[in-house]
Amino acid sequence: MPLNVSFTNRNYDLDYDSVQPYFYCDEEENFYQQQQQSELQPPAPSEDIWKKFELLPTPPLSPSRRSGLCSPSYVAVTPFSLRGDNDGGGGSFSTADQLEMVTELLGGDMVNQSFICDPDDETFIKNIIIQDCMWSGFSAAAKLVSEKLASYQAARKDSGSPNPARGHSVCSTSSLYLQDLSAAASECIDPSVVFPYPLNDGSSPKSCPSQDSSAFSPSSDSLLSSTESSPQGSPEPLVLHEETPPTTSSDSEEEQEDEEEIDVVSVEKRQAPGKRSESGSPSAGGHSKPPHSPLVLKRCHVSTHQHNYAAPPSTRKDYPAAKRVKLDSVRVLRQISNNRKCTSPRSSDTEENDKRRTHNVLERQRRNELKRSFFALRDQIPELENNEKAPKVVILKKATAYILSVQAEEQKLISEEDLLRKRREQLKHKLEQLRNSCA
């Protein structure tokens, strides 16, 4: 799609100047010139997207993984000395000069978010395209950094001397700058996992050039700590690996905080500091490690092992020998008591079953006897004598009425018996009188 330019003169040089800010690797281009040309031409979509949609500014960029500086195969084994004199190892920059360079380069946020690298490198173009596609606006920061880097490189060329120890000092400074950067980069996700083409083209370890590439740590406190830790009198070799960077105070605090947190990767994460402390110790001969760290791969992939919820919870803990003996004795006693408890419930259950069985037998006998007594009572009642289906309530009512009638009859019979007895007594007395009169 052609770009609509508001120029009246159709000059190809002017057209190229208007489109020139869209090219990435132009070290002589001024970043602030785009603001002056914004009235003459429309801005780039990647630069104007936040103003167009009114979104928040981009988050800080993650540290990039360049093949020239912080590739996993890069190893720097150089003596380091901060003395500016000729006796202490040939250092060309003093501590004040180095700190001034770091503070000037770390002054702006745009420089803090970018990583200084060789602009002629092929991976630099790839990384610029990646960062611009992902974060939108990385190219402008890279231009500003490349301009400042070019000025410092020119200053180094002017103040250059044929002293061969100067290259070693510059390599040592850049290796010091790479310490915290490699420590931060080992915690990041490897871009080769995400992107199809390899970012680290050069697998062989490269020497540290003083003009093409230089890396600065994102904080000056780590530089001070590293310079104070190294002795000034005797040069000490520094071995820098990407996977196992030397642990600083901030790294140890972050590792302690990571150990306190519980996550999916906590087991692998806690095993890493021990390995770092072993490999981060200074040694004379440094060997390159495989390009990809297993820690990075573990951070990329979440563990797929799931907890077996059907299994009983494991309460196993490691105790000293004395505590283990006590716990074993306690366990034996508990097993004995549990066995006793298990035997007593069994005996009690059998006793209860026997009691229930005898109770059922007795209850059945009582019901049979009650039924027989009801049948006998029914047979005594003349009204229900032939009624085999008479209910118990009817039997009881009829029996009560029959008993009352029988009692009334009994009273009548008793009264009649008394009358008959009196009559008999009277007749006996009259018979005796007749016998006495006849005699």
Swiss-Prot record:
Pfam families hit by this protein: HLH, Myc-LZ, Myc_N
Modified residues (N6-acetyllysine): K143, K148, K157, K275, K317, K323, K371
Assembly mode: Efficient DNA binding requires dimerization with another bHLH protein. Binds DNA as a heterodimer with MAX. Interacts with TAF1C and SPAG9. Interacts with PARP10. Interacts with KDM5A and KDM5B. Interacts (when phosphorylated at Thr-58 and Ser-62) with FBXW7. Interacts with PIM2. Interacts with RIOX1. The heterodimer MYC:MAX interacts with ABI1; the interaction may enhance MYC:MAX transcriptional activity. Interacts with TRIM6. Interacts with NPM1; the binary complex is recruited to the promoter of MYC target genes and enhances their transcription.
Biased composition (Basic and acidic residues): 266-278
Function, as annotated: Transcription factor that binds DNA in a non-specific manner, yet also specifically recognizes the core sequence 5'-CAC[GA]TG-3'. Activates the transcription of growth-related genes. Binds to the VEGFA promoter, promoting VEGFA production and subsequent sprouting angiogenesis. Regulator of somatic reprogramming, controls self-renewal of embryonic stem cells. Functions with TAF6L to activate target gene expression through RNA polymerase II pause release.
Free-text note on domains in this protein's UniProt record: The 9aaTAD motif is a transactivation domain present in a large number of yeast and animal transcription factors.
Biased composition (Polar residues): 335-347
InterPro entries: bHLH_dom (IPR011598), HLH_DNA-bd_sf (IPR036638), Myc-LZ (IPR003327), Myc_transcription_factors (IPR050433), Tscrpt_reg_Myc (IPR002418), Tscrpt_reg_Myc_N (IPR012682)
GO CC annotations on file: cytoplasm; nucleolus; nucleoplasm; nucleus
Post-translational modification: Phosphorylated by PRKDC. Phosphorylation at Ser-329 by PIM2 leads to the stabilization of MYC. Phosphorylation at Ser-62 by CDK2 prevents Ras-induced senescence. Phosphorylated at Ser-62 by DYRK2; this primes the protein for subsequent phosphorylation by GSK3B at Thr-58. Phosphorylation at Thr-58 and Ser-62 by GSK3 is required for ubiquitination and degradation by the proteasome. Dephosphorylation at multiple sites by the PNUTS-PP1 complex promotes MYC stability by preventing ubiquitination by the SCF(FBXW7) complex. Ubiquitinated by the SCF(FBXW7) complex when phosphorylated at Thr-58 and Ser-62, leading to its degradation by the proteasome. Ubiquitination is counteracted by USP28 in the nucleoplasm and USP36 in the nucleolus, both interacting with of FBXW7, leading to its deubiquitination and preventing degradation. Also polyubiquitinated by the DCX(TRPC4AP) complex. Ubiquitinated by UBR5 when not forming a heterodimer with another bHLH protein, leading to its degradation: UBR5 recognizes and binds a degron that is only available upon heterodimer dissociation.
Region spans: Disordered: 202-295, 335-365
Source organism per UniProt: Pan paniscus (Pygmy chimpanzee)
Residue positions where Phosphothreonine is found in the record: T8, T58, T315
Annotated positions of the Phosphoserine modification: S6, S62, S71, S81, S151, S159, S161, S293, S314, S329, S344, S347, S348
Record GO terms (molecular function): DNA binding; DNA-binding transcription factor activity, RNA polymerase II-specific; E-box binding; protein dimerization activity; protein-containing complex binding
Gene name linked to the record: MYC
Protein name as annotated: Myc proto-oncogene protein
Domain bHLH residues, every copy: 354-406
Residues with attached carbohydrate: T58
Domain of life: Eukaryota
